[in-house]
Amino acid sequence: MTDPPRPDPFPVTRLDSDAGALFVLQSKGEWWHAGFHLTTAIVGPTILTLPYAFRGLGWWLGFVCLTTMGLVTFYAYYLMSKVLDHCEKSGRRHIRFRELAADVLGSGLMFYVVIFIQTAINTGIGIGAILLAGQCLDIMYSSLFPQGTLKLYEFIAMVTVVMMVLSQLPSFHSLRHINCASLLLSLGYTFLVVGACINLGLSKNAPKREYSLEHSDSGKVFSAFTSISIIAAIFGNGILPEIQATLAPPATGKMLKGLLLCYSVIFFTFYSAAISGYWVFGNNSSSNILKNLMPDEGPTLAPIVVIGLAVIFVLLQLFAIGLVYSQVAYEIMEKKSADTTKGIFSKRNLVPRLILRTLYMAFCGFMAAMLPFFGDINAVVGAFGFIPLDFVLPMLLYNMTYKPTRRSFTYWINMTIMVVFTCAGLMGAFSSIRKLVLDANKFKLFSSEVVD
C-alpha cells in the first residue's frame, strides 16, 4: 500500500511569485550548460594545490584519496540528482538545496542549517576568488615592473570593480557562455603547467626530489587529514540543486550527462596536475605549483611566456568562479527585493539588483583585501561546509527518499560513506584549525604577503 501524497511545503505554484526562481534560477538550460556550470564550480585554480595535498599523503595514499574522493563525489552528486528527479516526478520540483533538505528530512531547521553552510562556502569562495585574482595581477605587475609601488590590496580593488560589473548579469543561465570559456581556460592552464613541470623534470635543471613524509607520527596524521580536507574541498561545490534548477524541465536524466562532461574534465586536469607537480617538486610542493615554477629567489623554472599565459588563464577563470558561487546570494537577495510583476530589466528590479549586487561584491573585495590569510580560514570553512553538503547529505537524502532496506548494499554503502566522511571532516576541521593557530603570528591585516 502506497503512502498518501504529502502536501508540498514548497509548491510549484509559488514559483510564479518567486523572483529568485524566475529571475536568477531561470530554467532554460540544456545538459551541456549544466556541465559547464559544474565544471566551473569544481575545476578551478585549486587543482594547482593537488601536489601540495600529495605532499602530506605520499604517492600511493595520494592516488587512493584522489580516486576515492572522485568516485564518492560523482556518486553523491548522482544520488542528489536522482532525489531531485524523484521530487520533480512527484510534483515537487525543488530548485534550492535548502528547500530540498527541509522537504525530504521534514525539518524546518535543516532549511537554516543548509542556508548557513551554503552562505559560508559561497561567500568564502567569492572572497577567495577575488584574492587569488588580485594575486595574479600582482604577479604579472611584479614581473613587468620589479620596482613597482602598487600593493596587493590595490589589485584586489581592481578585480572587485570588474566583478561588480560582471555581477549584473541577471541569471545563472546567462553565465553559460562564460562558463564554457571557463572550461576551456581550465584545460588551457592545466596543459601549460603540466607541460612546464614535465619539461623541468626532464631537464638538467630539475630540482632534487624527495618524497618522504613528516618524521613524527602525529605530524603525519595531521598532514594527512589536512590533505584529505584539501582534496575534499577541491571536489566540492555545494550548489548542485541550484545548477540542476537551470535545466529546462523535465530535468530527469540531463544532470547525469552534465556530470559525465564535468568529470571527464576532472579526470584530465586533476590527475595530470597532481602527478606532474608532485613528481617534479616532491615534498617541496607549494600550495600553488606556480609558486614552485616562479621561486622568490633564483631564475624562473619555466619559460616566462608559459607562466604568463597560465596566470592570465587562471585570472580569467577566477571571474567565472566568483560569479557562479555568488548566484545563491543573488537568488536570496532577489527573492526579497524584486517584483515578479515587473520585467527583469525594469527600473523597479534593475535598481535594487544594481545596488545589492554591487554592495555584495564590495563586501567580498573588502574582506579579500583585509584578510590575505584567507586560505587558512577557507580550509576550515571547507572542512565544516563541503563535507556535510557533498559527502553526507546526498546519501542521507537518498536513503530518506527511496528508503532502501537495511539489508541492501546501497543502504550500507551510503551509511558507510556518511560515517567515514563525517569522521574525516571532523579530523580535517581540527587539522585546519590547528594550522590556522600555528600561522596566526604571520597574519597582518591589509598585508601584501599572502600566508601559504
UniProtKB/Swiss-Prot annotation:
Modification sites for Phosphoserine: S17
GO cellular component: plasma membrane
Any one GO BP annotation for this protein: amino acid transport
Residue ranges crossing the lipid bilayer per the database entry: 34-54, 56-76, 113-133, 152-172, 182-202, 221-241, 261-281, 304-324, 354-374, 377-397, 409-429
Keywords for the protein's UniProt record, in alphabetical order: Amino-acid transport, Cell membrane, Membrane, Phosphoprotein, Transmembrane, Transmembrane helix, Transport
Topological type in the membrane: Multi-pass membrane protein
Top-rank taxon, per record: Eukaryota
Compartments, record wording: Cell membrane
InterPro entries: AA_transpt_TM
Described purpose of this protein according to its UniProt entry: May be involved in the transport of GABA.
Family from the record: Belongs to the amino acid/polyamine transporter 2 family. Amino acid/auxin permease (AAAP) (TC 2.A.18.2) subfamily.
Protein name: Probable GABA transporter 2
Species name: Arabidopsis thaliana (Mouse-ear cress)
